[in-house]
Regions:
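Terminal substrate-recognition subdomain of acyl/acetyltransferases
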Residues: 2, 83-84, 117-118, 124-184
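Short strand-loop-strand
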Residues: 25-30, 103
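Active-site acidic-Proline motif in GNAT/NAT acetyltransferases
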Residues: 86-88, 92, 121
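A short beta-loop-alpha structural element at the N-terminal edge
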Residues: 4-16
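Acetyl-CoA-dependent GNAT
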Residues: 23, 31-80, 87
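Hydrophobic alpha-helical core bundles mediating ligand binding, dimerization, or RNAP-core interactions
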Residues: 18-21, 25
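Conserved acetyl-CoA-binding loop-helix of GNAT-fold acetyltransferases
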Residues: 91-106, 113, 127-131
Length: 184
């Protein structure tokens, strides 16, 4: 089990997503969204997220800021994944932990495949796709990666519930420390 704890967000936490995406630089936004979103486009994207249909996952730092996020959009028979990790936190496995949690959710939804679409030059996403042994097709500067999912079972459902409970406990501990003040 990874020591990176990934927690699912509720619709009430939508406001916490906006600072995360706004903290992405111009190039990072271009790689994450496929085009260089300005601040208004980022806000519109966050406002359009359908928490009833989709799943949003986050990794929090000790100050309770989102440092990594995954949006899993449920489609007809598949789920599409977008991942972002803030620059100072890359190379630590956050993207892989977010992808693993998204994989588990998509499997438990009963979809047949997890799909990622990105620019071919997005080395981080291409690396994640290869590590997850996704089937990658690159053409005209864009890449699509697919992972066929096995059916959900008791283990996958338990794994998801357990991961969420541990992440909620970790978040509560961090929140308690923030109430106590620095150095506690």
């Amino acid at each position: 089990m990874s020591d990176i704890l990934v927690r699912e967000l509720s619709r009430l936490e939508r406001p916490a997503l906006e600072p995360h995406f706004l903290a992405l630089g111009h190039e990072d936004r271009r790689l994450r969204f496929g085009t260089a979103f300005n601040d208004a486009a980022v806000r519109a994207y966050v406002g359009r997220i359908d928490f009833e249909r989709d799943a949003l996952f986050a990794v929090f730092d000790d100050s309770l800021h989102i440092i990594g996020a995954a949006h899993v959009a449920r489609g007809d028979g598949h789920a599409e994944l977008g991942v972002s990790v803030l620059e100072g936190h890359r190379g630590r496995g956050l993207g892989g932990a977010l992808l693993a949690r998204a994989h588990l959710r998509a499997r438990n939804w009963g979809v047949r495949a997890l799909f990622m679409h990105c620019l071919s030059e997005n080395g981080a996403m291409m690396h994640l796709a290869r590590r997850q042994e996704m089937e990658i097709v690159a053409e005209s500067g864009e890449a699509e990666a697919w992972l066929r999912l096995s059916p959900a079972d008791a283990s996958s459902h338990f794994g998801e519930v357990f991961a969420q409970r541990v992440a909620l406990f970790d978040y509560a501990l961090k929140r308690g420390r923030s109430w106590l003040g620095p150095g506690r």
